[in-house]
Amino acid sequence: MTKRTFGGTSRKRKRVSGFRVRMRSHTGRRVIKSRRKRGRDRIAV
């Protein structure tokens, strides 16, 4: 059996790929737009 190596840190996740971070850049807004268009329940982390 292999160890589960992904710990996961909430603060780090939010800082990297949270909604407010996405809205800062043009490409981030494009991500939000495409996820809305696709009908994702979770737009950002």
Curated annotation (Swiss-Prot):
Please give the Pfam families that the UniProt record associates with this protein: Ribosomal_L34 (PF00468)
User: Where is composition skewed (Basic residues) in this entry?
Assistant: 10-45
Question: GO CC terms on record?
Answer: ribonucleoprotein complex; ribosome
Describe the family membership recorded for this protein in Swiss-Prot or TrEMBL: Belongs to the bacterial ribosomal protein bL34 family.
Region: Disordered; residue ranges are 1-45
Does Ribonucleoprotein appear among the keywords?
yes
- Superkingdom is Bacteria
The name of this protein is Large ribosomal subunit protein bL34
Keywords on record? Ribonucleoprotein, Ribosomal protein
The reply to whether Oxidoreductase figures as a keyword in the UniProt entry is no
**GO terms of molecular function:** structural constituent of ribosome
Query: What stretch or stretches form a coiled coil here?
Result: none
Gene Ontology BP terms: translation
